[in-house]
Amino acid sequence: MAAKIYHLDVVSAEKQMFSGLVEKIQVTGSEGELGIFPGHAPLLTAIKPGMVRIVKEHGNEEYIYLSGGVLEVQPSTVTVLADTAIRGEDLDEARAMESKRKAEEHINNSHGDIDYAQASAELSKALAKLRVIELTKKAM
């Protein structure tokens, strides 16, 4: 019988955010949404700004915002190396809303492809933070 759990480490440049046994995770890779279950094939991929949804050993869920990074899947261990990682409960909703508003304003007033691309990336990050906040509130 295959294992129903595996070890997950979520690490940012500042600190280790999570280390423990999990049933599965969900993360946004460079090619789209990924669900990583026990026994997943080895994989190395870039992570887009978004969240990692962690389903812990006994079914409890945790959400962590990621600004991007790398996902490595090995037979019994999964590692998320994030540029920036923030727990859902540590995100500031008012700041995320203000970032969203500013990014939308920059998109509407952009002059050139570079301005638009930068504002679009900032909007994606703000929306991801707001989604993590929303899911964290539901899980509590």
From Swiss-Prot:
Keywords: ATP synthesis, Cell inner membrane, Cell membrane, CF(1), Hydrogen ion transport, Ion transport, Membrane, Transport. Transmembrane segments: none annotated. GO terms for molecular function: ATP binding; proton-transporting ATP synthase activity, rotational mechanism. It comes from the Bacteria. It is found in: Cell inner membrane. One of its GO terms (cellular component) is proton-transporting ATP synthase complex. It is a peripheral membrane protein. It holds the Pfam family ATP-synt_DE_N. Produces ATP from ADP in the presence of a proton gradient across the membrane. NCBIfam families: ATP_synt_epsi (TIGR01216), PRK00571.1-4 (NF001847). F-type ATPases have 2 components, CF(1) - the catalytic core - and CF(0) - the membrane proton channel. CF(1) has five subunits: alpha(3), beta(3), gamma(1), delta(1), epsilon(1). CF(0) has three main subunits: a, b and c. PANTHER family: ATP SYNTHASE DELTA/EPSILON CHAIN, ATP SYNTHASE EPSILON CHAIN, CHLOROPLASTIC. Belongs to the ATPase epsilon chain family. HAMAP family: ATP_synth_epsil_bac (MF_00530). This is ATP synthase epsilon chain. The lineage of its organism: Bacteria, Pseudomonadati, Pseudomonadota, Gammaproteobacteria, Enterobacterales. The gene is atpC.
